[in-house]
Amino acid sequence: MIEPVKRQLSSSGAQLPRSSGRGRTVARKLSDILTGHPGRAAVTMFALVITGFTALLRLPAVSATGESLSLVDAAVTATSAVTVTGLTSLGPDAFSLTGQVIILVAIQVGGLGIVTLGVWLTLLVSRRLSLRTRLLSSESLGVSKLGEVPALLLTVLIFTLSIEALLAAAMLPVFVTEHGPAKGAFHAVFYAVSAFSNAGFVLETNSFDHPVVLTTINIGAFAGALGFPVVYMLYRMVFHRAAMNLHTRLTLEVTVVLLVLGAGLVAAFEWQNPMTLGQLSPLEKVHEAIFASGMTRSGGFSTYEVMDQNDPTLVVTSVLMFIGGGSGSTAGGIKVTTLAVLLLAILAEIRGDEHIQVHHREISSSLVRVAVAVVTAGALLVLTAVVALTAVTDQGITVATFEALSAFGTVGLSTGLTASAPEAGQWILIVLMFVGRVGIITLAAGLAARSTPTFYRYPTERPIIG
């Protein structure tokens, strides 16, 4: 049972054992990052962690051949693991057990959230959470009330480890039967972490032949894509009889609609395709279609080659990848609540409503402005990346667009472009994965100069729209 922290941390902090001088030095440096601008702190921490894992993956012991990986291969793998994407330039057999363990740790760090782990480390060493740190945590986790941050941080940790343990236990008998106790246990843990984190990393190319593994991974990816704020809200509803907030309601509604709609479209377009669903039984087709629909919004696992799909399915998959999962989750994309706010704004405009209302709540115009900014900036970024990818590779616009959307949405479904692209193309995909995980608005805020308040306003005019 998830038991979040009951007490709010005071300004002086919870009393913990005193740390060593070296620990205080580390804490001070970490605190300097965490107490800066929230957006800049998140960007800095992600960049530092990715750099660290890139260095680790360049060690000779990581490679199955004993030779050091190239800088770009290590950077692609590290970025993909920390951003829980799944796009790689190397196959799963390119890594030794040491390399697989490092990738597993990187996925777990990225899935839990670098900011979350940084805040926990700060709390353990310095014994307090400053207001700035709470602001950073609230922005990273997608909560609006600073008082909920400590409880949510503990909920994130307990829920993540509990779900991953359950997923591993469900898959353990299958993998032990196939690989033996030790290797089977490692496979179960690896796929549990990869599924819940929506990372899409695999240890073997034929890992999803068993229906138990397929179903377990689908459930894990679905839970991970909901977002920690939703999980925390559901916990409070069950154990504290709290009322469901609007964010949770919209996230659940849009997630279910997209899952069902995506599965229906995949089944309709691929039902007779012998390369994907055509040779399966009707029940297996439905199961595979649901799995494919869930994986397109961040999971990144696939039971068949992406390019074997028909063109309409590629379009549907591309749209779902751009949307992504829930805010504060392991998923990327523009997020399902962003889509919901935009659709509600369009509906209100069509109806002529002065205010945007849903479920007896009103959505502010400032939130609509943020949603428009997220979608527009994301679309422009992907468009720019597609142009750049087509310029540096010999692939057409379909392949480049799919790969760019997969990187931006931190999905991991691949046409093979990540592995075949020249270094320039791979660095483009690295940037997309980084921005997709950090969030384009967070990145912009982190890179922007300190804002200067204005004490005046200009006259209002209305340009012609449409």
Give, region by region, the residue ranges found by the protein language model.
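Membrane-proximal intracellular helices of multi-pass ion channels
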Residues: M1-G466
